[in-house]
């Protein structure tokens, strides 16, 4: 009845796993008890779980990212500590099979459940506001996409205490991920977590792509769009093209494991290297899916806090488009050692070097924007400056790895690990932190505490260099990835320095938690009354903070690239107050079907992992029926009256006048 699921699936003999899992259960029970005690379930259901408001969904993506960041960071600390202990001549506290699970989970969590939610959360908040829209094109899909990501994160977490996770590395290369060498459920957990999350991300890509193409404010041509919107457009083009490749690749691996097909086996016509090509055809665009939106963040931040128009806007746009195209023809640099031949390696090495050119163009544009600007050293600018240094180092080492002979020496070493952490942490994570500090008041109506924000930055940047620069040297010394036992003692000192760096990053995370708590506590002293705390340039700053449900009482008409900045000259606000005629606004209704479909998806994924056929069929049918019911629903909107809008907007204008703005 329960397929392969038995009580033996619970790892009673692993004290670290059991203690961790019990702690997770206790924390979940405490949260549920607190919500019950304060009678907040109804509030959460109607205001959050069922919401289709892009701003609230953005907040929920951020919560998911920070919860999973804690899990991923703990995994990183465990791995680094194990390596330090093992390099000192001891066995350590993590057996190889447990270390390999942590190693795999760390990569999956940080890419799919930290970086992606942070990036998608920022796009959710900013895109509709920047283009003058009231919401995204498909509000229900937005809700569904989020909850699919949550269900896949829960499925991954279940593997910690029920069964095991994959021991293959985060990309699960065959034949190791095949049924012959990984006969347990670990790879199946990996497959279905990524599959459900990937479907949600694909729906997000379609949603944002249509939103940008079809819902821009009147007059906002492509070359009047803010750079963040441009980078988001290119990102979602990449999502729509590349994520179906991941979906198909996972389907083929599933057929190999479940039905004894031979797509990626070493016999009967299979080809394991086809999998490696397919996974990286998705995997390298994924790097730019993560990094392009934060390029947009930095573009907005440097222009705002330098009090200047962005230098080289057109070149930035073309550089973004160039990266979008080139990102599909560089994937083979991840496996020069495969043996494709000198000509193939040379081609992909050259394309990899070429893609560094538009990235370099962007960096110079940001530097020239800052040059001779009246720079306000806000924490967002600090994260940007930190990015410029760390990402440049990561980019240079990436160009070095694009040379096939050098890659043959450095492939699979810690040099490579240092490189991609330079890019992902120094680029994506720093960029998301800059964006959070920058756009936070637009969500919550008050600014974040700058003192603790800057402390967090300095601990992060110092910890980052201590944690990852030693890895370059370890890679050059010959230390490979995935080592957990019998590590050469000559690596011990540098591993200790890297571990100290990880502790500094941990302190940085604690500073960020303190920053949020202090900001909430002192919010009455840091209110953003005008909706424009940074003297911004783009449309999101033309509405109140927090932005109202409808975003804009009147859809703006755009005449210039920095239209809001230009309009603020003279008597802009007074003109608006005297000229607005309000009308009823139709907004999308909340729906609980997205949440329900995610529950059914969780049951489907769990039953597929454990071969519980009846539950798998029932949950799949429930998903189809739920989607069918949603398609029949015609009562999808409600009306906000003109009187209510007028009341909200007049309060905003009073705040504007109190601030002395004209």
From Swiss-Prot:
The gene is cyoB. Ubiquinol oxidase catalyzes the terminal step in the electron transport chain. It comes from Buchnera aphidicola subsp. Acyrthosiphon pisum (strain APS) (Acyrthosiphon pisum symbiotic bacterium). The chain crosses the membrane at residues 15-35, 59-79, 107-127, 146-166, 190-210, 233-253, 278-298, 310-330, 347-367, 381-401, 414-434, 457-477, 494-514, 587-607, 609-629. It comes from the Bacteria. Gene3D superfamilies: Cytochrome c oxidase-like, subunit I domain (1.20.210.10). Heme b binds at residues 106, 170, 421, 481-482. The cytochrome bo(3) ubiquinol oxidase complex is a heterooctamer of two A chains, two B chains, two C chains and two D chains. GO terms for cellular component: plasma membrane. This is Cytochrome bo(3) ubiquinol oxidase subunit 1.
């Amino acid at each position: 009845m329960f397929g392969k699921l038995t009580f033996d699936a619970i790892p009673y003999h692993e004290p670290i796993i059991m203690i961790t899992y019990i702690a997770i259960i206790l924390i979940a029970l405490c949260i549920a008890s607190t919500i019950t005690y304060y009678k907040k379930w109804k509030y959460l259901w109607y205001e959050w779980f069922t919401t289709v408001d892009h701003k609230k969904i953005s907040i929920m993506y951020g919560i998911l990212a920070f919860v999973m960041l804690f899990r991923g960071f703990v995994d990183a600390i465990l791995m680094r500590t194990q390596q330090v202990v093992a390099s000192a001549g001891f066995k350590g506290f993590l057996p190889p099979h447990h270390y390999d699970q942590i190693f795999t989970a760390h990569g999956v969590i940080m890419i799919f459940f930290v970086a992606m939610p942070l990036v998608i959360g920022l796009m959710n908040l900013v895109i509709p506001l920047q283009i003058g829209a009231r919401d995204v094109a498909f509000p229900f899909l937005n809700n569904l996409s989020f909850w699919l990501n949550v269900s896949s994160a829960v499925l991954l977490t279940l593997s910690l205490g029920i069964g095991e996770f994959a021991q293959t590395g985060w990309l699960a290369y065959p034949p190791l991920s095949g049924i012959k060498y990984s006969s347990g459920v670990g790879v199946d957990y990996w497959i279905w977590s990524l599959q459900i999350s990937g479907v949600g991300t694909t729906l997000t890509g379609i949603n944002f792509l249509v939103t940008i193409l079809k819902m821009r404010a009147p007059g906002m041509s492509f070359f009047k769009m803010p750079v963040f919107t441009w980078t988001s457009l290119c990102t979602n083009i990449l999502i729509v093209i590349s994520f179906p490749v991941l979906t198909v690749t996972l389907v083929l691996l599933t057929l190999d494991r479940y039905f004894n097909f031979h797509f990626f086996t070493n016999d009967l016509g299979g080809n394991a290297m086809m999998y490696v090509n397919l996974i990286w055809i998705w995997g390298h665009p994924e790097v730019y899916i993560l990094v392009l939106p934060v390029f947009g963040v930095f573009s907005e931040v440097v222009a705002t806090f330098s009090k200047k128009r962005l230098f080289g806007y057109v070149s930035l746009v073309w550089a973004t488009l160039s990266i979008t195209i080139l990102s599909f023809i560089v994937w083979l640099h991840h496996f020069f050692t495969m043996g494709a031949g000198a000509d193939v390696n040379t081609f992909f090495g050259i394309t990899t070097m070429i893609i560094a050119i538009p990235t370099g163009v962007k960096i110079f544009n940001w530097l020239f924007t800052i040059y001779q600007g009246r720079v306000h050293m806000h924490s967002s600018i600090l994260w940007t400056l930190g990015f410029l240094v760390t990402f440049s180092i990561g980019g240079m080492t990436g160009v070095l790895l694009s040379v096939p002979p050098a890659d043959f020496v450095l492939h699979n070493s810690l040099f490579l690990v240092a490189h991609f952490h330079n890019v992902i942490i120094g680029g994506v994570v720093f960029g998301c932190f800059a964006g959070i500090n920058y756009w936070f008041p637009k969500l919550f109506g008050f600014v974040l505490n700058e003192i603790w924000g800057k402390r967090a930055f300095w601990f992060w940047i110092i910890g980052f260099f201590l944690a990852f620069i030693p890895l370059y040297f370890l890679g050059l010394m010959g230390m490979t990835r995935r080592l957990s036992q019998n590590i050469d003692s000559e690596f011990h000192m540098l591993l200790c320095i890297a571990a100290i760096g990880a502790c500094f990053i941990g302190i940085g995370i604690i500073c960020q938690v303190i920053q949020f708590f202090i900001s909430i506590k002192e919010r009455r002293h840091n209110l953003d009354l005008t909706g424009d705390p940074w003297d911004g340039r783009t449309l999101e700053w033309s509405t109140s903070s927090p932005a109202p449900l409808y975003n804009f009482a009147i859809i703006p008409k755009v005449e210039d690239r920095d239209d809001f900045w230009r309009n603020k000259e003279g008597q802009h606000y007074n003109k608006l107050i005297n000229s607005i005629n309000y009308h009823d606004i139709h907004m999308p209704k909340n729906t609980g079907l997205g949440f329900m479909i995610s529950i059914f998806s969780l049951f489907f994924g769990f039953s597929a992992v454990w071969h519980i056929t009846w539950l798998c069929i029932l949950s799949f049918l429930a998903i189809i029926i739920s989607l069918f019911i949603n398609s029949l629903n015609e009562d999808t909107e409600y009306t906000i009256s003109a009187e209510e809008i007028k009341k909200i907007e007049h309060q905003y204008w009073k705040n504007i006048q109190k601030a002395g703005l004209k």
